[in-house]
From Swiss-Prot:
Lineage per the UniProt record: Bacteria, Pseudomonadati, Chlamydiota, Chlamydiia, Parachlamydiales
Domain called Radical SAM core: residue spans: 96-328
Residues of the active site: E90 (proton acceptor), C334 (s-methylcysteine intermediate)
Cellular component per GO, a single term: cytoplasm
Cofactor: [4Fe-4S] cluster
UniProt entry keywords in alphabetical sequence: 4Fe-4S, Cytoplasm, Disulfide bond, Iron, Iron-sulfur, Metal-binding, Methyltransferase, rRNA processing, S-adenosyl-L-methionine, Transferase, tRNA processing
Protein name as catalogued: Probable dual-specificity RNA methyltransferase RlmN 2
Gene field: rlmN2
Gene3D superfamilies the record matches: 1.10.150.530, Aldolase class I
Disulfide bonds: C103-C334
Function: Specifically methylates position 2 of adenine 2503 in 23S rRNA and position 2 of adenine 37 in tRNAs.
Matches recorded under SUPFAM superfamilies: Radical SAM enzymes (SSF102114)
Length: 358
């Protein structure tokens, strides 16, 4: 069993079944989720016999840190984790002012296969379990603790399509936001999706208050189908209706991400079409100039084209931002997460890079 399979009540029941006092449950959860201790041996206020029982029956930890790499500006750190089956996933820590945002992966690889995203080019291998998602935060929290800091925001924008691993993602959100666990406000948690309609509708009924982001990337279904194969399954009109439903039920504004690709979706006409598509919606468009990926012929638009695109949106009263690229020098920017060099393990290949501090 994994430790994340236990909430307080389940842990109390487990302790009683193994002849232990129930008050240990609060101690154990505090060690793991508040202190970031992922070793039974280091839980000093537990008896040796209890620690041995825990070690025998409950797995801890589930991720092994292979390496972490820091960007030149020291504002982005990419972590490479090995799972117990040998597969590898990545997380990114973004330092911005007082914010400490972690971009977590929800799958090994990604089934969406977006034309401009490195993760999608690698194919899909498997879903992550809730524990494997949660521990990305716990281990980075432990890494930050030496600086007296902790994770403040979580974005499900790493490897994978979160809503195609629905149960694990929702379970991880509940743990990360629970006051007795990581206590990260749901308003500081963001889930990104390419537009899995049934997942969006289901999420709107969960009673969660997380932010929802649609990876739109095109002003119409015709272009979207070309750059996002998943779009063939989900008509744009249905996706937008489900996003509206989410906004209405959760009272949360929604965000549309739009990767600008030179000569594909960056013309002023595309901007006018996008403005018409989103007219009347309480939303923000987050423009992302394409981050180059080796082997792909796609290009980032010129600054003039980006400025013109934004001007059209502003003129149509569409709130928009242009994301400042962070971590592109270490392959940690939006769309760049991928693993590029096999070392004999199963699943995705290992990232080719030099470990920070080596």
């Amino acid at each position: 069993m994994d430790y994340a399979d236990f909430d307080h009540q389940k842990l109390v029941e487990w302790l009683k079944a193994h002849g232990e006092k129930e008050f240990h449950a609060k101690q154990i959860l505090s060690w793991i989720y508040q202190k970031g201790v992922l070793s039974w041996d280091k839980m000093s206020n537990l008896s040796q016999s209890l620690r041995e029982k825990l070690a025998k029956h409950i797995r801890l930890p589930v991720l092994e840190l292979v390496r972490y790499t820091e960007s030149i500006d020291q504002e982005t750190i990419k972590f490479l984790w090995r799972l117990r089956d040998g597969n590898l996933v990545e997380s990114v820590l973004i330092l911005s002012g007082i914010r400490r945002t972690v971009c977590v992966s929800s799958q090994v690889g990604c089934p969406a296969k977006c034309a401009f995203c490195a993760s999608g080019q690698q194919g899909f291998f498997r879903n992550l379990r809730p524990t494997e998602i949660i521990e990305q935060i716990l281990q980075i929290n432990a890494w930050l603790s030496s600086k007296g800091e902790k994770v403040s925001h979580v974005v499900y924008m790493g490897m994978g399509e979160p809503l195609k691993n629905y149960e694990s993602v929702v379970a991880s959100i509940r743990v990360l936001s629970h006051p007795d666990f990581c206590n990260i406000s749901q308003r500081r948690i963001t889930v990104s999706t390419v537009g899995v309609v049934e997942g969006i509708k289901r999420l709107s009924k969960e009673g969660l208050k997380v932010n929802l982001v649609l990876s739109l990337h095109a002003p119409n279904q015709h272009i979207r189908k070309k750059i996002i194969p998943y779009a063939r399954k989900y008509p744009l009109e249905e996706i937008l209706e489900s996003m509206d439903e989410y906004a209405q039920k959760t009272k949360r504004d929604i965000t549309f991400e739009y990767t600008l690709l030179a000569g594909i979706n960056d013309h002023p006409d595309h901007a006018h079409e996008l403005a018409h598509l989103l007219k009347g919606k309480q939303c923000t468009v987050n423009l992302i100039p394409y981050n180059p990926i080796p082997g792909l012929r796609l290009k980032r638009p010129e600054k003039k084209a980006i400025k013109q695109f934004r001007s059209v949106l502003y003129g149509s009263h569409i709130v928009n931002t242009c994301r400042y690229t962070k971590g592109d020098d270490i392959g940690a920017a939006c769309g760049q997460l991928a693993l590029q060099e096999r070392e004999g393990q199963t699943g995705l290949p290992m990232l080719k890079e030099v470990a920070f501090g080596s």
